[in-house]
From Swiss-Prot:
The gene is pdhA. The lineage of its organism: Bacteria, Bacillati, Bacillota, Bacilli, Bacillales. Signal peptide: none annotated. GO terms for biological process: branched-chain amino acid catabolic process. This is Pyruvate dehydrogenase E1 component subunit alpha. It comes from Geobacillus stearothermophilus. The keyword Oxidoreductase applies.
Length: 369
């Protein structure tokens, strides 16, 4: 007698999940509006300011790479190619919102108020680079991949408990979604309806590991399903799409509707970091050329020029401003006194415990000689 075997619809279930996360786009690669209904309400001046910040950030990246090669900066993770994901997402925030960045997300915290020279000091490992000025709602860049997701969930819950109309936004890359902290963070925020925005900048490679070898999920946005929170996949080279998605997520959050996971499809044009990574060993020239055609600055420039809002002269002005301010910032970083062991001890507590007081005195005597 034959036994009838029930066929569970496993494959169909997965297909249905992935189908719920099509890529959200407003501007195509030619800078043309393909989703008029989703166009955000931004004035002409706001559109120009967004472009200024993206151009400035590209120049900052180029100069930071040069300074690193000269030995004037330490650790640095290039950002070119991710300006729409980073700058347009920040553009949707308010001053009272908190940013919990990863190590590639220094541009967002600079635009949120961290002085540029302190960002350079952070790169050098100077303690003052992590001393955030009063009123600037950012945390120092997180080096441990994914850990910022747990911290963002906690900050967001704190904002909720205090009745603040503000959000905590955090960023990681595609590799970060393979970390346990990622799942703990989105699950915790979902369970407590914490006002958090989780941005996954899917730049296709976790250092050298392609996203296809990190997960069999067809999108990273669908990882939100397990936590029971909304998720969306966005064209991360389209600044208007990124802005619109983050703006909507922020509105949800401050209205008590909980967190959102946003996957931005983007590409880093440079190496993972300046610490010896060679992307030509794991990326083809064809792939790099394909993503170069999607450049967020080129795309947005075409859009603004078609509206008569941007010119070569205006862009050159931003470039010169950026170069001058970077020059001043690195000079200020150079003039900052070198850190001493006593500096590192003294900033740990408001009042030092006895064992650190003892160590402080020992090093103070050594440093005075």
């Amino acid at each position: 007698m034959g036994v009838k075997t029930f066929q569970f619809p496993f494959a169909e279930q997965l297909e249905k999940v992935a189908e719920q996360f099509p890529t959200f786009q407003i501007l195509n690669e030619e800078g043309e509006v393909v989703n008029e209904e989703a166009m955000p309400e931004l004035s002409d001046e706001q559109l120009k300011e967004l472009m200024r910040r993206m151009v400035y950030t590209r120049i900052l990246d180029q100069r930071s790479i040069s300074l690193n090669r000269q030995g004037r900066l330490g650790f640095y993770a290039p950002t070119a190619g991710q300006e729409a994901s980073q700058i347009a997402s920040h553009f949707a925030l308010e001053k009272e919102d908190f940013i919990l960045p990863g190590y590639r997300d220094v541009p967002q915290i600079i635009w949120h108020g961290l002085p540029l020279y302190q960002a350079f000091l952070f790169s050098r490992g100077h303690f003052h680079g992590n001393q955030i000025p009063e009123g600037v709602n950012v945390l120092p860049p997180q080096i441990i991949i994914g850990a910022q997701y747990i911290q963002a969930a906690g900050v967001a819950l704190g904002l909720k408990m205090r009745g603040k109309k503000a959000v905590a936004i955090t960023y990681t890359g595609d590799g970060g979604t393979s970390q346990g902290d990622f799942y703990e963070g989105i699950n915790f925020a979902g369970a407590f309806k914490a006002p958090a925005i989780f941005v996954v900048q899917n730049n296709r490679f976790a250092i050298s590991t392609p996203v296809e070898k990190q997960t069999v999920a067809k999108t990273l946005a669908q990882k939100a399903v397990a936590a029971g929170i909304p998720g969306i996949q966005v064209d991360g080279m389209d600044p208007l799409a990124v802005y619109a998605a983050v703006k909507a997520a922020r509105e949800r959050a401050i209205n008590g509707e909980g967190p959102t996971l946003i996957e931005t499809l983007c590409f880093r044009y440079g190496p993972h970091t300046m610490s010896g990574d060679d992307p030509t060993r794991y990326r083809s020239k064809e792939l790099e050329n394909e993503w170069a055609k999607k450049d967020p600055l080129v795309r947005f420039r075409k859009f603004l020029e078609a509206k008569g809002l941007w010119s070569e002269e205006e862009e050159n002005n931003v470039i010169e401003q950026a170069k001058e301010e970077i020059k001043e910032a690195i000079k200020k970083a150079d003039e900052t006194p070198k850190q001493k062991v006593t500096d590192l001890i003294s900033i740990m507590f408001e009042e030092l415990p006895f064992n650190l007081k003892e160590q402080y005195e020992i090093y103070k005597e050594k440093e005075s000689k």
